[in-house]
């Protein structure tokens, strides 16, 4: 009866439903009813079948009273329609229906009770006698929630594998069994239950009504082993609750230093991994932008060539008629300018920003296709005989001369990166990222999820010099602004104070020297012991 006694103590210490994030409330008072009296009578006859309880058990005072009240609540709102036919007058059939309802409430009461105490045989018996629907109490707790709350792994296995209970079944506060199993009272039994629920597909990042994830609860209670299991299984270390707190914030609030160190290291690794992945995407993104700019400049060059040829033909056509006056040419040019469409005007305006298209095409690296691998039959090369002659004219001729260049550094010079400042306009999106807009009026998406400064430095390398990346915040200052020490001369009292601090005793010669220099300083009066 050890487990039953411990269950009774835990039930008396707080509410039967530990809301995990909302606090433990007061224990509800039992509701006397006829069905509950019958349930208490049956509980007096029930015997434990587990190895830990072989003797007949008395009903647990606090736990039984609470579950009796829950059974009363179960009997009222979840009354099946088939068991309560509408009748105007009392009849024996109505009494039989009420008896069936009472039996259903008793079955639900014992089902939750068996799951909480961990009696597998009793739980199977109650589940076989109950209806097909899953009974719940007034807070939405079912048998799988009670089994998870008290860390009963055997009951969890029976409910999930034999009776197909969902592992992510929600309560009224959107709590899952994985939320309920993580608690400081379940330190010794929480890990096996967590491993089992994760194996069965439990949601790692499920959030309650206040936005708490299982990792938030483990970090708040300082359960380092649970935190490690959740993080290694893929829990989101940057998840925020309704108040914007992360799991590491709860570690700081409750002074769980070990959990805070582990979460800080996990967050750093996650950030670096995400940054490396986005930088890989950025390389592919820049190659796509280069191809887009190359195609745009080719189309622009073709359009510019067509317009230039049309202008030349128009000029030649005007030269073939020397009789018309300059006024007619001016009117014709004005009419031609007015007849242009807005698209042509915009094209002409955008061309003014590109004075040299050919030069830009030469600067853009040509998009190259990946060479196809060509299989070549390996050839076997036999080593040649060593030339034993000391005549340098005989083949193979020895070549020892080589033009040696002068290097000014150890590392190779970085290749110049292409600048997209004349093709792209980078704007902040308000969330730390950037939005890209081309000169031809198109938005580029999707953009790698990188900070705005990183995107600006990658796309505008001329604006952000390469050597100014590290150290951050390095800038030249004037020597006049450098803080300097104050010059201490002979007339400064500081020298006398230093000399007085270095002496153990003040003899007459020393006091005379200090008095002749600037005078004796004001010494603090000695404190007398009361």
Swiss-Prot record:
Q: Where are the ANK repeats?
A: 139-169, 173-206, 210-239
Give compartment(s). Answer: Cytoplasm, Cytoskeleton, Spindle; Cytoplasm, Cytoskeleton, Spindle pole
Record keywords: ANK repeat, Cell cycle, Cell division, Cytoplasm, Cytoskeleton, Mitosis, Phosphoprotein, Repeat
Subunit text: Interacts with PSRC1; recruited by PSRC1 to the spindle during mitosis.
> Pfam families recorded for this chain?
Ank (PF00023), Ank_2 (PF12796)
Q: Which GO terms describe its biological process?
A: cell division; mitotic metaphase chromosome alignment; positive regulation of microtubule polymerization; regulation of mitotic cytokinesis; regulation of mitotic spindle organization
Locations of Low complexity compositional bias?
Answer: 1-15
Compositional bias of kind Polar residues: 32-41, 326-341, 386-402
| Entry superkingdom | Eukaryota
- Looking at the UniProt entry, the stretches that span the membrane are none
- Name the chain's protein: Ankyrin repeat domain-containing protein 53
Which cysteines share a disulfide bond? Answer: none
């Amino acid at each position: 009866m050890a487990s039953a006694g411990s269950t009774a103590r835990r039930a008396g210490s707080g509410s039967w439903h530990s809301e995990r994030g909302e606090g433990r409330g007061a224990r509800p008072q039992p509701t006397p009813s006829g069905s509950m009296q019958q349930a208490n009578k049956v509980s007096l006859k029930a015997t434990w079948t587990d190895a830990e309880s072989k003797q007949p058990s008395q009903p647990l005072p606090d736990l039984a009273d609470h579950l009796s009240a829950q059974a009363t609540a179960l009997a009222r709102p979840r009354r099946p329609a088939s068991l309560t036919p509408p009748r105007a007058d009392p009849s024996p059939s109505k009494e039989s229906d009420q008896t069936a309802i009472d039996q259903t409430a008793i079955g639900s009461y014992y089902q939750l009770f068996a799951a909480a105490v961990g009696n597998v045989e009793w739980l199977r018996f109650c589940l076989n006698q109950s209806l097909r629907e899953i009974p719940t109490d007034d807070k939405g707790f079912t048998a799988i929630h009670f089994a998870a709350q008290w860390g009963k792994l055997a009951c969890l296995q029976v409910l999930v594998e034999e009776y197909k209970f969902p592992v992510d079944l929600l309560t009224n506060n959107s709590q899952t069994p994985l939320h309920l199993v993580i608690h400081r009272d379940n330190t010794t039994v929480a890990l096996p239950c967590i491993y089992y629920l994760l194996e069965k597909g439990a949601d790692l990042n499920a959030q309650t009504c206040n936005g708490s994830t299982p990792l938030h609860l483990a970090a708040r209670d300082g359960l380092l082993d649970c935190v490690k299991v959740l993080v290694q299984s893929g829990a989101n270390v940057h998840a925020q609750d309704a108040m914007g707190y992360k799991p590491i914030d709860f570690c700081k609030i409750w002074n769980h230093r070990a959990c805070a160190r582990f979460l800080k290291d996990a967050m750093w690794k996650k950030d670096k991994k995400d940054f490396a992945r986005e930088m890989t995407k950025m390389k592919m993104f820049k190659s796509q932008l280069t191809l887009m700019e190359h195609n745009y400049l080719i189309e622009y060059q073709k359009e510019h060539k067509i317009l230039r040829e049309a202008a030349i033909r128009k000029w030649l056509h005007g030269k073939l008629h020397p009789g018309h006056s300059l006024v007619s040419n001016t009117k014709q040019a004005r009419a031609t300018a007015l007849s242009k469409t807005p698209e042509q005007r915009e094209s002409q305006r955008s061309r003014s920003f590109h004075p040299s298209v050919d030069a830009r095409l030469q600067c853009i690296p040509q998009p190259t296709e990946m060479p196809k691998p060509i299989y070549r039959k390996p050839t076997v090369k036999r080593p040649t005989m060593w030339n034993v002659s000391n005549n340098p004219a005989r083949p193979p001729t020895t070549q020892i001369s080589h033009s040696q260049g002068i290097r000014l550094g150890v590392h190779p010079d970085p290749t110049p990166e292409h600048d997209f400042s004349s093709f792209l306009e980078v704007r902040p999106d308000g969330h730390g990222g950037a939005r890209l807009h081309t000169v031809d009026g198109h938005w580029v998406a999707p953009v790698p999820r990188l900070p705005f400064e990183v995107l600006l430095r990658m796309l505008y390398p001329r604006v952000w010099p390469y050597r100014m990346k590290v150290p951050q915040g390095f800038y030249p200052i004037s020597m006049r602004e450098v803080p300097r020490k104050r010059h201490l001369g002979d007339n400064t009292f500081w020298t006398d104070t230093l000399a007085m601090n270095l002496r153990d005793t003040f003899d007459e010669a020393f006091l005379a020297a200090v008095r002749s220099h600037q005078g004796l300083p004001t010494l603090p009066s000695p404190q007398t012991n009361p």
